[in-house]
Amino acid sequence: MGAIRYDMVKKLLHTRYRVSDLEKTISFYKDVLGLEEVRRQTSGRGSQLVFLKAPDSDVEIEICKFDESGPIVVGPDLTHLAFEVEDLDEFAKKAAAKGYSLSDGPHSTGSGRIAFIDAPEGYEIELIERGAKS
């Protein structure tokens, strides 16, 4: 057996999250986080799929609704998705106007500030403002 070639994997393309309320979740990612809807489709098994991405990113989030898989359980080991934001304070104001508040932070780090917000279905989102003054 030969050595593993690390150049075989080129880049991360998407990650998938299963949800029970597709439209509420899509609304959060689009209206609160500002993601763009790339496409919608139905899988061969009947899953409803919506792909989203940040404006300056090629990586997509695949939101999936598939009732046959049973109830949604977000395990404690699934920690979060992280997004870079321009202005954390402005983001918090806009999110609050849409009914969402930060669940933790903002906190200063060596390279900026971070905060967290809870997405629908119990998924956690980390927000990172790089280069912010501590």
Explain the meaning of each model-derived region.
Residues G2-K24, L78-L81, G131-S134:
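N-terminal beta-strand motif that seeds the catalytic metal site of vicinal oxygen chelate
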Residues G2-M8, R40, F51, A92-S134:
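Vicinal oxygen chelate
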Residues V9, R16-D58:
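Core segments of cupin and vicinal oxygen chelate
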Residues D21-L22, E86-D89:
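Helix N-cap motif at beta-to-alpha junctions
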Residues F28, D89-K94:
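Short amphipathic alpha-helices within nucleic acid-binding modules
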Residues D56-V59, E68-G70, L88-E90:
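Short, charged/polar surface micro-motifs in flexible loops or helix N-caps
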Residues S57-I61, G122-I125:
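Short, charged/polar, Gly/Pro-enriched secondary-structure boundary elements
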